[in-house]
Design a protein with these regions (language model features):
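Domain-level signal for soluble alpha/beta catalytic cores
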Residues: 1-475, 479-825
Length: 825
């Protein structure tokens, strides 16, 4: 009997921490924990047995850091040897105890994926595939993907597990105290992604204790329709005598976990700092308990890496402008591979009110598959809005869905059997919400009854694949009233009936209604209002159209979707709407915080589009805006123009630094996410390169700032955080000496002394490597007492940083920049 069959109404119990027990058994600072699978197998077998005897149902293989990046041809042991030994040790413990399941443990690679980092998505899938195959060969009963801080890497690991095994897949992520992943994801976005990918259970582990996890767990349970797993740390860490200890004892830990079960959690265990005693008391508490029934949720969620759009009562605006149909400039941009043009269209639509962006790059003379894949990646680097993948080419659709970081809206499927046969397997494999067109082999029915019949057929076929109605959005189809006088009425009737009879969400390409008519925006905007009143939940429109956006905000105010008419008032102020008529300003500004489908606050003025690319704005403004929005080519071009009339330092201090500061403050406030922060830094870097070349050719003296040493400490290969800090510090003109990862204390001290560095930054992700960080600080205090030390990493807190002797705890990259500005004066 497998774990799926055995679970039923049981509460599953995972084991607890591994690293702290290995430290207690003699693991040295900087020593790789996975090597003990081979060097000290008896220790691993004993730890596994202790957890099983304590009452754990599931033990984790000691493979958290096992991947080819760490165990390559230069390592003491290769990857297969490490995983084979780990699985053998775990299986031996299960045989000795006569019970239990072995989970193949997959941890993060320690690298950021492109476009934020340098690791290709398919390479990440390949890295995890190697471990999965070895784990399956070694007898794993399930796969646990844990401690993931990036939804993109999480997706790569899940795909590797799905495509190379039929084992149950559990996936847990590591959130910060504000309920965010490193790359900006929320519990809601994680649930949408993982349920779409079809994992068996999802949850949270590490980083926080059970008290700090509670609000995050509540959010996971609010949206999850599958079991939720919670594996907290034993509270918050501190250092005592060179070892990491935690502030919650086993009885207190179990009392907090009791509350988790009452909330509806289905599986519990421990992470850093928990021991067999924690698990023993946890198992005793769980005796006689059954897990609460899981209530299926009916939320239609579309996500990016960070943002979630929920379809329902509040209409969703889908920007239509990234589409070559009828757009000669867009077609030429595709032919010329001018991606910046496409990115500007995206940013303009976001600022003018779009909540989702349609992406269509179909042009006969280009490679649509390659272009779609590239455009999706580039768009996700500059905007956090979810995307609608719009293509009839199933290969392009699959490539886009595979590379997409989130749960996409897919446009589209229809009632033709061959189309359903091609599209539904992709929706099932990659997850997504699919637009369903009410057309089949016979064409578009002239009646609402005919379109409803197709909608029902599509829903029935989708059910065969396990695709629920909540992930189907019905398009009732707009027929132009110039040729079909009753077309609008049929469409509106179909929209109403879909909502009432099927309970599905609805979508329309609104502007089709007016094709061939004069003053189309008048017809479009009035039909848009009628459609929203009929139950339309999403509209593909031009958000740069003032008439359409006025209809949108007016409807929301009238339908009591806009509390105190706040969004309408803000939008009216942006546009200075005349008292009568639809004339006047041609733009549309986004309004402030609204319902789940309403756009986020924007900054476009009455011109109807952002200032990007505007001939009216000068190069100074262009440079500032380009840096803020991560447009590399435009930033470089604007910098070059400014240097014709301005000296280099003025360009840097008047344009570049204020823009970086603005983005940094947005990141600290949670309104800007990590990909945007990094792309802003990349845009600044491209402008700096132009400025640097100008300075070298003219002999102009540049601004020199202090050297800073950065390193990930001995034994730790996870240098994502350190690399992010490096990018930002360099953009603030600091000279960063990046020593890399797995760096010995002696090497850090040597570089600090040799360059008389006044600030050292140390990073660690794993609890087992924090003692190495503490040792590094001790050596710096002795050999380079003038140097300040800032520390960061998922396992650290302010108290912990104080205890190991650091001068500053920096919770994120901007905090590191701020501290550098304080001490390096």
């Amino acid at each position: 009997m497998g774990i799926r069959e055995d679970w039923n109404d049981k509460i599953l119990i995972f084991d607890g921490g591994m690293g702290s027990l290995l430290q207690g058994a003699g693991l040295k600072p900087g020593e790789l924990p996975e090597t003990w699978n081979i060097k000290h197998p008896e220790v691993l077998v004993k730890i596994h047995e202790d957890y099983l005897n304590a009452g754990a149902n599931i033990i984790l293989s000691n493979t958290f850091g096992a991947n080819r990046l760490k165990y390559n041809e230069t390592a003491e042991f290769n990857l297969d040897e490490i995983v084979d030994a780990a699985m053998k040790n775990a299986r031996t413990a299960v045989e000795h105890c006569g019970r239990g399941y072995v989970a193949l443990d997959l941890g993060p690679t320690g690298r950021l994926l492109k476009p934020m980092g340098d690791l290709d998505f398919e390479e990440a899938v390949s890295i995890y595939t190697e471990v999965v195959k070895a784990g399956v060969r070694g007898g794993a009963d399930l796969i646990l993907i844990e401690t993931m801080s990036d939804t993109y890497e999480l997706k790569a690991a899940v795909l590797a597990a799905k495509e190379n095994s039929d084992l149950p897949i559990f996936a847990t992520t590591i959130f910060d105290g504000k309920g965010k992943l490193l790359t900006g994801g929320t519990p809601k976005s994680v649930v949408a992604l993982l349920e779409g990918l079809g994992v068996d259970a999802l949850g949270i582990n590490c980083g926080l204790g059970p008290v700090q996890m509670k609000p995050i767990v509540e959010e996971l349970l609010r949206y999850a329709s599958i079991p939720v797993v919670v594996n907290p740390n034993a509270g918050l860490p501190r250092s005592e005598g060179g070892k990491t200890v935690y502030d919650i004892d086993p009885p207190e830990f179990v009392e907090e976990m009791k509350g988790m079960l009452e909330m509806g959690v289905s599986a519990v265990g421990g992470c850093c700092g928990t021991t067999p005693e924690h698990i023993r008391l946890l198992a005793e508490m769980c005796k006689g308990r059954t897990r609460k029934p899981i209530e299926p949720k009916n939320d239609t969620l579309i996500t990016s890496y960070a943002s979630v759009v929920e379809m329902g009562t509040d209409p969703v605006i889908i920007g239509e402008r990234i589409n070559p149909t009828g757009k000669s400039k867009f077609k030429q941009a595709l032919r010329d591979h001018n991606l910046e043009y496409i990115l500007r269209e995206a940013i303009t639509q976001q600022e003018n009110g779009a909540a989702v962006l349609d992406v269509n790059v179909g042009l006969p003379e280009i490679d649509e598959v390659a272009m779609m894949r590239e455009v999706v990646q580039e768009l996700q680097a500059v905007t956090e809005l979810p995307l609608q993948i719009d293509t009839t080419d199933t290969e392009a659709m699959e490539q886009a869905l595979r590379i997409y970081n989130g749960k996409a809206l897919i446009n589209s499927v229809n009632g033709k059997q061959e189309v359903m046969d091609a599209v539904f397997p992709l929706v099932k494999h990659y997850g997504g919400t699919v637009v369903a067109l009410t057309i089949d082999e016979e064409g578009i029915p002239a009646t609402a009854d005919g379109r409803m019949a197709i909608a029902r057929k599509i829903c029935a076929e989708a059910e065969k694949y396990g695709i629920q109605k909540k992930d189907i959005v019905i398009d009732a189809l707009c027929m132009t009233i110039s040729s079909e006088p009753t077309g609008a009425l049929v469409t509106l009737e179909t929209v109403r009936r879909v909502r009432q009879e099927l309970g599905c969400n609805t979508i329309l390409g609104v502007s089709n209604i007016s094709f061939g008519l004069p003053q189309r925006e008048i017809v479009n905007s009035n039909f848009f209002t009628m459609a929203m009143q009929s139950g339309l939940t999403a509209a593909i429109i031009n958000p740069n159209s003032a008439a359409m956006m006025r209809s949108y905000y007016s409807y929301r105010a009238l339908a009591a979707l806009d509390e105190h008419c706040g969004d309408y008032i803000e939008q009216a102020a942006r546009l200075a709407i005349p008292k009568a008529g639809v004339g006047g300003a041609s733009g549309a500004g986004a309004a402030g915080s609204a319902g789940s489908g309403a756009p986020a606050a924007g900054a476009a003025g009455a011109s109807g589009s952002a200032d990007i690319g505007s001939q009216a704005s000068g190069p100074e403004h262009q440079l500032t805006v380009s840096v803020e929005r991560g447009l590399k080519e435009q930033a470089a071009s604007a910098a070059g123009e400014l240097l014709k009339t301005m000296d280099s330092l003025t360009v840097i201090n008047s344009c570049m630094i204020p823009a970086l500061d603005k983005v940094g403050k947005g990141f600290e406030a949670g309104t800007v996410f990590l990909p945007q922060l990094l792309m802003s830094a990349e845009a600044a870097k491209s402008a700096f390169e132009v400025i640097k070349n100008q300075m070298e050719s003219s002999g102009e003296a540049g601004e020199k700032k202090d050297k800073i040493v950065l390193a990930t400490v001995k034994g730790d290969i996870h240098d994502i955080g350190k690399n992010i800090v490096k990018v930002l510090l360099e953009n603030y003109s600091y000279d960063v000496l990046d020593l890399g990862k797995d760096v010995a204390p002696e090497s850090i001290v040597e570089e600090t002394i040799k360059n008389h560095v006044r600030l050292v930054g140390l990073s660690a992700l794993m609890t087992t490597t924090v003692p190495s960080m503490e040792e590094t600080i001790k050596q710096l205090r002795k050999e380079a007492p003038w140097a300040k030390v800032m520390v960061g990493g998922a396992v650290l807190t302010q108290e912990y940083a104080d205890m190991i002797g650091a001068d500053a705890y920096c919770r994120d990259a901007m905090a590191s920049v701020n501290y550098a500005q304080q001490v390096l004066v």
